Design a protein with these regions (language model features):
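Sec-dependent, cleavable N-terminal signal peptides
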Residues: 1-24
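Extracytoplasmic/lumenal domain signature
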Residues: 22-500
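Short acidic/proline- and small/hydrophobic-mixed sequence motifs that coincide with surface turns
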Residues: 373, 520-521, 532-537, 577
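Beta-sheet-dominated interaction scaffolds and their linkers
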Residues: 499-530, 569, 604-607, 615
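Surface-exposed binding patches on compact interaction domains or structured appendages
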Residues: 500-510, 528-566
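A short beta-strand micro-motif common to beta-rich folds, especially ectodomain repeats
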Residues: 525, 573-591
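Extracellular/luminal low-complexity segments enriched in Ser/Thr/Pro
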Residues: 562-578
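C-terminal edge beta-strand
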Residues: 593-607
Length: 622
């Protein structure tokens, strides 16, 4: 697409503001515990990934740099900021490295996968895998869609997952060469899906129909005037796409604006179905088509041959500004369902007396039904009291140990911390413009929350710098880290896992017994885990004369256990008998799972049982 000029403009605005040293004002702020210069260029849109690469119980920081000022590098830092290793790359990184064990069979040792070329003027695109010691394992180059003589660049971060459930990890990414790709664990091409325009969005992976295979959910650009390979005639805007494991289109929703945002997927309302959330971008907005920007919430209708992305009740929600931010999902108010959080804005900054109403960036949070969370939207202010655009995607965790979640994002030179009520809390101050998402964790396993972000330094702006901030003693709460890094996890799945959920069907049993014909009747129950993970289940109580086999077991994701229920009919005269309830419980980690206990009423009818047989006619196809 004619897609790069707006990015140049936005970057120039951001760095022009950075050209003057900040004048300190009065707000409370947190200084870095350490900062580290990297041997590569500035860090712009590469969000750090945290992972224990070497198994020492401490987290390493994995991040990439641009080519602005120095050669680009992929760097791994220890918890104290020591550079563990760095490798020089031929092309810049504006994506977030993914970390996963992609070996087949799995060996428990993680690898690092990074996409390159996401730069307006230096867009030689590749996806490269390294082992945990920085040795290159493979490299895959995209195609030259723009005719520059080099592969088109990749802004999209790689997403890693086992799409077909066979134990072999796949890598999915979008490219500026107008394709969505899937590679196998060896970096070998598996398929591509042509979208006829650039892809900036990072793919989410989720099993939308609970069949054991992962679907790919991703946003794209589109320019109208042509015909897609399947005959569809698009208009100017973008798409939200769902692809299956083989690269076949399951659903496509035409949008009136490009989609730079990376989708977030989760069961936000607790109904057992997954929802999809994504924001609209600003390419066409900057061309003078000032259509209303939105954040969308979708439910997937899988009943037809082609799935349909349907608007959720209360969605889409209008926002003041378009942008590049991707939504995060978290239970901000501890009510058991998930809220949707996103930043907005694309360029500029303003003084306090101009904002509101003349702001450039806002942070939004909604309940699952589209109603705003109390205190949102809010217009954050940085260290200098300025409001600015928010290109960063929010991350969410309890960073101060108070039992409540905070929202973190970068704006101007700072990482800002906002409470669940929309009140701005801490300001984590650096010395240069920040665009990426902060990562949250306990780097050195000392019980304190660490926040990591990449950027540069006003006095050394040709180099990349990594900053780490540390909160107080006992501030790290591992149970309250719902969205701690870009696209939630080191694989960048963008998926909020569902808790294990006990499901037993049918919900009641009605057994028919022909009087005088035997001593027992049999029926069946199907027990499933309709959530993620696993749980132990057991038949805790049954009526007299009733047996259930098996009586206990472990329910894994999408597994089904067939339970045989046998009712003794000895001693019953004709009539209908309510025998009582079979009680089945499920527990994980010592706590009941959702749907537990399941109570199944058992009813026995004894008398004359009549059977009717219906004819069926079969005709073979010729």
């Amino acid at each position: 697409m004619r897609m790069y000029l707006w990015l140049l403009a936005a970057l120039c605005l951001g760095f022009l503001w950075s050209a003057a040293a900040p004048q300190q004002v009065a707000p409370q702020y947190l200084s870095p515990r350490w900062s580290r210069q990297l041997p590569g260029g500035r860090i712009e849109d590469s969000s750090p990934t945290l992972y224990d690469l070497d198994g020492d119980g401490k987290l390493e920081i994995i991040i990439g740099t641009t080519k602005n000022g120095a050669s680009p590098v992929l760097a791994v830092l220890e918890d104290d900021g020591t550079i563990k290793w760095s490798v020089t790359l031929p092309d810049p990184v504006n994506s977030s490295p993914a970390v996963a064990d992609i070996s087949y069979p799995p060996d428990g040792i993680p690898e690092i996968i990074v996409s390159t070329g996401g730069d307006v003027t230096q867009q030689r695109g590749s996806v490269i895998a390294f082992n945990r010691n920085g040795v290159q394992l493979w490299r895959y180059d995209t195609t030259d869609a723009q005719g520059t003589g080099t592969p088109s660049g990749n802004w999209s971060s790689p997403t890693v997952g086992d799409l077909d459930g066979n134990g072999d990890m796949e890598i999915v990414f979008g490219s500026w060469d107008r394709n969505i790709y899937m590679l196998n664990h060896l970096g070998q091409y598996q398929w591509h899906y042509h979208v006829a325009d650039t892809v900036w969005s990072t793919a989410a992976l989720a099993d939308l129909d609970r069949d054991g295979d992962l679907e790919i959910i991703i946003g794209t650009d589109i320019a109208g005037g042509g015909v897609l390979p399947d005959g569809y005639r698009p208009t100017d805007g973008g798409f939200v796409l769902i692809l299956d494991k083989n690269g076949q289109k399951l659903a496509r929703r035409q949008m009136n604006e490009v989609i730079y945002s990376s989708p977030a997927v989760g069961d936000v309302d607790g109904d057992g179905r997954l929802e999809i959330f994504v924001g609209t971008g600003m390419y066409w907005y900057l061309q003078g088509r000032y259509t209303q920007p939105y954040v969308y919430g979708f439910r997937v209708n899988t009943s037809g041959s082609e799935w349909v992305l349907e608007d959720l009740p209360g969605w889409p929600q209008p926002v003041a500004y378009p942008g590049m931010s991707s939504p995060a999902l978290a239970d901000l108010d501890s009510d058991g369902d998930l809220e949707i959080i996103i930043g907005t804005g694309y360029a500029g900054s303003s003084e306090p007396n101009q904002c509101p109403p003349h702001c450039y960036g806002a942070l939004y949070a909604w309940h699952h039904n589209g109603s705003p969370v109390s205190g949102f939207p809010m217009w954050p202010k940085d260290y200098m009291g300025k409001n600015a655009f928010i290109r960063s995607s929010p991350t969410v965790a309890d960073v101060d140990g108070d039992g409540q979640l905070e929202i973190l994002f970068s704006m101007n030179w700072d990482v800002l911390v906002v409470g669940p009520n929309g009140q701005q809390e801490d300001i984590l101050h650096t010395t240069y413009s920040l665009f990426a998402s902060p990562a949250i964790g306990d780097l050195d396993n000392d019980g304190k929350t660490d926040v990591v972000i990449g950027g540069s330094n006003y006095y050394d702006s040709s180099r990349g710098y990594v900053y780490a901030f540390t909160f107080g003693a006992n501030s790290y709460n591992p149970a309250l880290q719902p969205w701690p890094m870009f696209h939630r996890d080191p694989r960048h799945t963008g998926y909020y896992p569902q808790p294990p959920r006990l499901n037993v069907s049918p919900s009641s049993l009605y057994l028919l017994h022909q009087y005088g014909s035997g001593s027992a009747e049999t029926a069946y129950l199907r027990l499933r885990n309709t959530g993620d993970g696993s749980f132990h289940w057991a038949v805790s109580s049954i009526p007299s004369g009733v047996t259930v086999v098996p009586s206990s077991g472990t329910a894994f994701y999408i597994s089904t256990a067939l339970l045989t229920v046998t009712v003794s009919t000895t001693g019953y005269e004709t009539g209908t008998y309510s025998l009582g309830n079979a009680i089945i419980t499920g527990a994980s980690g010592g706590s009941p799972v959702q749907g537990s206990p399941a109570s199944i009423p058992v009813t026995l009818y004894v008398g004359q049982v009549h059977r009717s047989y219906l004819p069926i006619i079969l005709r073979s196809a010729r």
